[in-house]
């Protein structure tokens, strides 16, 4: 396990913690897409079904458990604990537009037709597009709170670091996972515009705002 993998995991974990802290401290989930969080919870659930049957390392197991807990606690806070603050009017992305093609693709393009492998592939494809409801929500409202932009930045950084991890593994281990790499590139592309706005606005102390579609 190389440094890019570890830094990627830490960036991912930091993003999730930032989101949880934001919701808990403000007692509000305004500006957060519950649909994206449901998709992320589904990603971790389908990816980590081998949690108790395939031991790799203590680090790997602990991270799986932590990611699952963070994902489901986030969903709980959005849809139960602070549901009165949930911005349902703007969280309107149609999940079937993602779930249907992702499900179909996971059956068509995978490494083997076993239930665990198909579900793992499904989780990889779904993660690459799970952030779209959140980005759609931001484009619809025209702005995002600073803490939300930090959350998105560290999610995007996690993906960039994982791309570096795969490059490093190819160089040192001659290992190449086409499904993960292609999906990771697609996911990173979705963050490109956001990265630009983050650097030019948020890091300069300005609020991230976008033109509201008519």
Curated annotation (Swiss-Prot):
Residues 1-4, 53-58, 111-116, 169-178 are lumenal. The record marks 5, 117 as: Interaction with the K-D-E-L motif on target proteins. Binds the C-terminal sequence motif K-D-E-L in a hydrophilic cavity between the transmembrane domains. This triggers a conformation change that exposes a Lys-rich patch on the cytosolic surface of the protein. This patch mediates recycling from the Golgi to the endoplasmic reticulum, probably via COPI vesicles. It is found in: Endoplasmic reticulum membrane; Golgi apparatus membrane; Cytoplasmic vesicle, COPI-coated vesicle membrane. One of its GO terms (cellular component) is endoplasmic reticulum membrane. The gene is Kdelr3. This is ER lumen protein-retaining receptor 3. Receptor for the C-terminal sequence motif K-D-E-L that is present on endoplasmic reticulum resident proteins and that mediates their recycling from the Golgi back to the endoplasmic reticulum. GO terms for molecular function: KDEL sequence binding. Residues 47-48, 159-169 are annotated as: Interaction with the K-D-E-L motif on target proteins. Keywords: Cytoplasmic vesicle, Endoplasmic reticulum, ER-Golgi transport, Golgi apparatus, Membrane, Protein transport, Receptor, Transmembrane, Transmembrane helix, Transport. It comes from the Eukaryota. PROSITE patterns: ER_LUMEN_RECEPTOR_1, ER_LUMEN_RECEPTOR_2. It is a multi-pass membrane protein. Belongs to the ERD2 family. Its main location: endoplasmic reticulum. The lineage of its organism: Eukaryota, Metazoa, Chordata, Craniata, Vertebrata. Residues 204-207 are annotated as: Important for recycling of cargo proteins with the sequence motif K-D-E-L from the Golgi to the endoplasmic reticulum. GO terms for biological process: protein retention in ER lumen; protein transport; retrograde vesicle-mediated transport, Golgi to endoplasmic reticulum. The record marks 193 as: Important for recycling of cargo proteins with the sequence motif K-D-E-L from the Golgi to the endoplasmic reticulum. The chain crosses the membrane at residues 5-24, 33-52, 59-79, 93-110, 117-135, 150-168, 179-199. Residues 25-32, 80-92, 136-149, 200-214 are cytoplasmic. InterPro entries: ER_ret_rcpt.
């Amino acid at each position: 396990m190389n440094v890019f993998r570890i830094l990627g995991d830490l960036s991912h974990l930091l993003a999730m913690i930032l989101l949880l802290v934001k919701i808990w401290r403000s007692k509000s989930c305004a500006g957060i897409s519950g649909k994206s969080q449901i998709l992320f919870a589904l990603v971790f659930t389908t990816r980590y079904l081998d949690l108790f049957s395939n031991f790799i390392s203590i680090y790997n197991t602990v991270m799986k458990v932590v990611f699952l807990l963070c994902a489901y606690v986030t969903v709980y806070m959005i849809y139960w604990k602070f549901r009165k603050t949930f911005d349902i009017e703007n969280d309107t992305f149609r999940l079937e537009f993602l779930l249907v093609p992702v499900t179909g693709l996971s059956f068509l393009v995978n490494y083997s037709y076993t239930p665990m492998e198909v579900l793992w592939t499904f989780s990889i494809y779904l993660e690459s597009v799970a952030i779209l409801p959140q980005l759609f929500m931001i484009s619809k409202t025209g702005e995002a709170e600073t803490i939300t932009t930090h959350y998105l930045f560290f999610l995007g950084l996690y993906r960039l670091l994982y791309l570096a991890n795969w490059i490093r593994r190819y160089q040192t281990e001659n290992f190449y996972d086409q499904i993960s790499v292609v999906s990771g590139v697609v996911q990173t592309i979705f963050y490109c515009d956001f990265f630009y706005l983050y650097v030019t606005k948020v890091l300069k102390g300005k609020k991230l705002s976008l033109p509201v579609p008519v």
